[in-house]
Amino acid sequence: QKPKIFFTLHMGCVDILIFVLSELLSQIDVLYTPAKNKTLENKLFKIRQRQGGKMFPATPSGVKNLFRNFLNKNNVLIASDLVPHEKGVYEKFFDKECFCIDLVEKLSKKGTHDLHFIYLTKGEQKKYKVVCKKIKNKITTAEMNKYFEDAILTAPELYYWEYKKFRKLRPNKSNIY
């Protein structure tokens, strides 16, 4: 059985996905953005790793270590809807161009892992419902964004719009925020 790449977006509580995947898999590596408040970050880090997920900060060294584990056939979870600090590509998101993380595209091209889109939407009896879709093994960033759009349209109020997806535009475009 192949290891897995899970990509997700900030919709509902992403930490629930860490807990669910940690419960279902013997191992999961998670790329995340550390909280700016150090006290809060230390507590969140411990809670997230308690279930068995291994956390890697979205820094050059964190991505490098995650990639090393990826090459060793570890399972990976990436919330890939955030705006990258440096490396990325411009793609459409709800018909507007924005700067996007292309890590899932790069990892999926290796063909070593099964690819899944996992996210939370509104539940009927419970607050959230986990949705997991197996995807073809190679995906482009544009295709990934389309999956995000479809998920958001199921419950737009659950998406974390405050991450300002359109804040990093091409140099000749003005910031809309």
Outline where the language-model segments fall:
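Catalytic core of membrane glycerolipid acyltransferases/transacylases, capturing the structured
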Residues: 2-60, 86-92, 96-98, 111
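Non-catalytic C-terminal accessory region of glycerolipid acyltransferases
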Residues: 3, 23, 27, 60-177
